[in-house]
């Protein structure tokens, strides 16, 4: 008995110890990392089990996964872009506000600029003009002349003595000067000096006479114009000057030098038009010119009319072969003639001849002045060449055409050209 109870007492403590140890093991908390790993492994296990249940091959599953990833990435990209766009709009708004904001420095600068402009307006200067220096006047040379009046014969005597320091208008560094002298306002009578070749200091020593009653002289102006002669084109004006007759003392002879001024640009004077027909018969070698009419002729007489008639010259190589004239039509600027003239021209010569038509104003006392001139045939151009060509293309048929009259000197220069 004693031994049994002793054994129980000895065995009891270990039982109690075990009991106390077990509870401590059971209630010990699990670490957070271990819990998460268990949850993830459970989800993975579950997901894999579900995948195994789907009746699809592995490659199809991979494709679906890739598409899903792409969709996610696209969504992310769109969200980012939207955010960036909003930021940019905000920035723009700030900049706009900055631009519209008034800068006091700019206002001051603007005020200063406006003040400068007002100052310029008062003085009448622009920026370019402020810096520009006054240009020197172009020197055109000078002319020495003399004036006298013959009271006994009612004549104005104009002497063209010499010119000096003329500008060079020709290629060789010289000019071919001559002087034109006329009275305004009528311009009816014009005089010209001889042409002096290749010189800038010509000596003329020529005198011209205008028959003008002294009572009418005060209302006239004398013009002296220096020209450069050109054989093949229009003569260039070098310079001119005007002398009002009411400023001249005719109690003695006036002799002086005057500087040439730039000539006023004169409009091409209208001289009028003429209509004539041409007819050529090659077999007979006969050229017929019919002067039909003229219109709007230049006024040549004091009464504002003219006494026009027409001269026709047949020319070859600068020589006048034949000359014909119409009748004179009195006091008219629109004469009607209808007069026919014939010339013998062999067929082999027709391409070498020229028909020169000149309208003149008849004057009983003095020289008959040319109103205007035109020529057809060899070396002609424009409307004149077309008229001649039409005549040759239509033998035996009269071809009529209107022509504009040209200045006599210009036509003569063209006739002098040899091709």
UniProtKB/Swiss-Prot annotation:
- Keywords, comma-separated and alphabetical: Calcium, Cytoplasm, Cytoplasmic vesicle, Differentiation, Glycoprotein, Lipoprotein, Membrane, Metal-binding, Palmitate, Phosphoprotein, Repeat, Synapse, Transmembrane, Transmembrane helix
Q: Where is the composition biased (Acidic residues)?
A: 117-131
Sites binding Ca(2+) 4 sit at 301, 307, 361, 363
- The segment annotated Phospholipid binding runs over 133-379
Where is Ca(2+) 3 bound in this sequence?
230, 233-234, 236
SUPFAM superfamilies assigned to the protein according to its UniProt record, in alphabetical order = C2 domain (Calcium/lipid-binding domain, CaLB)
Which cellular components does GO assign to this protein?
A: axon; chromaffin granule membrane; dense core granule; plasma membrane; synaptic vesicle membrane
Pfam entry (one): C2
Limits of the C2 domain: 139-258, 270-403
Report the locations given in the UniProt record: Cytoplasmic vesicle, Secretory vesicle membrane; Cytoplasmic vesicle, Secretory vesicle, Synaptic vesicle membrane; Cytoplasmic vesicle, Secretory vesicle, Chromaffin granule membrane; Cytoplasm
Q: Which residues are on the Vesicular side of the membrane?
A: 1-58
List residues modified as Phosphotyrosine. Answer: 227
- Which GO terms fall under molecular function for this chain's record? calcium ion binding; calcium-dependent phospholipid binding; clathrin binding; phosphatidylserine binding; SNARE binding
As cofactor, the record names:
Ca(2+)
PANTHER family the UniProt entry points to: SYNAPTOTAGMIN (PTHR10024), SYNAPTOTAGMIN-1 (PTHR10024:SF239)
| Quaternary structure and interacting proteins, as annotated | Homotetramer. Heterodimer; heterodimerizes with SYT2 in presence of calcium. Interacts with SCAMP5. Interacts with STON2. Forms a complex with SV2B, syntaxin 1 and SNAP25. Interacts with SV2A, SV2B and SV2C. Interacts with RIMS1. Interacts with PRRT2. Interacts with DNAJC5 in a phosphorylation-dependent manner. Interacts (via N-terminus) with RAB3A. Interacts with SYT12. Interacts with calmodulin. Interacts with DNM1 (via C-terminal proline-rich domain (PRD)); this interaction facilitates vesicle fission during clathrin-mediated endocytosis (CME).
- What is this protein's function? Calcium sensor that participates in triggering neurotransmitter release at the synapse. May have a regulatory role in the membrane interactions during trafficking of synaptic vesicles at the active zone of the synapse. It binds acidic phospholipids with a specificity that requires the presence of both an acidic head group and a diacyl backbone. A Ca(2+)-dependent interaction between synaptotagmin and putative receptors for activated protein kinase C has also been reported. It can bind to at least three additional proteins in a Ca(2+)-independent manner; these are neurexins, syntaxin and AP2.
**Record text about domains:** The first C2 domain mediates Ca(2+)-dependent phospholipid binding.
Q: What is this protein called?
A: Synaptotagmin-1
Originating species: Pongo abelii
């Amino acid at each position: 008995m004693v031994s049994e109870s002793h054994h129980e007492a000895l065995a009891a403590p270990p039982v109690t110890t075990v009991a106390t140890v077990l509870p401590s093991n059971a209630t010990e908390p699990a670490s957070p990392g271990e819990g998460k790993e268990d949850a993830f492994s459970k989800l993975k296990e579950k997901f894999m089990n579900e995948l195994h249940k789907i009746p699809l091959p592995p490659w199809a599953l991979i494709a679906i996964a890739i598409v899903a990833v792409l969709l996610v990435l696209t969504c992310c990209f769109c969200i980012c872009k939207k955010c960036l766009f909003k930021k940019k709009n905000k920035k723009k708004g700030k900049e706009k506000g900055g631009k519209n904001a008034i800068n006091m420095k700019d206002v001051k600068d603007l005020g200063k600029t406006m003040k400068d402009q007002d100052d310029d307006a008062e003085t009448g200067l622009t920026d370019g003009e402020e810096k520009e220096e006054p240009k020197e006047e172009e020197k055109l040379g000078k002319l020495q002349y003399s004036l006298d009046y013959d009271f006994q014969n009612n004549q104005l005597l104009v002497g063209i003595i010499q010119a000096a320091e003329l500008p060079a208008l020709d290629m060789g560094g010289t000019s071919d000067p001559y002087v034109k002298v006329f009275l305004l306002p009528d311009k009816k009578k014009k005089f010209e000096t001889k042409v002096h070749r290749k010189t800038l200091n010509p000596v003329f020593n020529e005198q011209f006479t205008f028959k003008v009653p002294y009572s009418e002289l005060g209302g006239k102006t004398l013009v002296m114009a220096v020209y450069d002669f050109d054989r093949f084109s229009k003569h260039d004006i070098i310079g001119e000057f005007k002398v009002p007759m009411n400023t001249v003392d005719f109690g003695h002879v006036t002799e002086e030098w005057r500087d040439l001024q730039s000539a006023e640009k004169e409009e091409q004077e209208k001289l009028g038009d003429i209509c004539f027909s041409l007819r050529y018969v090659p077999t007979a070698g006969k050229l017929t010119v019919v002067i039909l009419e003229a219109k709007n002729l230049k006024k040549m007489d004091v009464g504002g009319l003219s006494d026009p008639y027409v001269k026709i010259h047949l020319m070859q190589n600068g020589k006048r072969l034949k000359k014909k004239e119409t009748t004179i039509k009195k006091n008219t600027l629109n004469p009607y003639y209808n007069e026919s003239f014939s010339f013998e021209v062999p067929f082999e010569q027709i391409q070498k001849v020229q028909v020169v038509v000149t309208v003149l104003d008849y004057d009983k006392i003095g020289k008959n002045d040319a109103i205007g001139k035109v020529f057809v045939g060899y070396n002609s151009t424009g409307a004149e060449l077309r008229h001649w060509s039409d005549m040759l293309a239509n033998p035996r048929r009269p071809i009529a055409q209107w022509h504009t009259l040209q200045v006599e000197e210009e036509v003569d220069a063209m006739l002098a050209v040899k091709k």
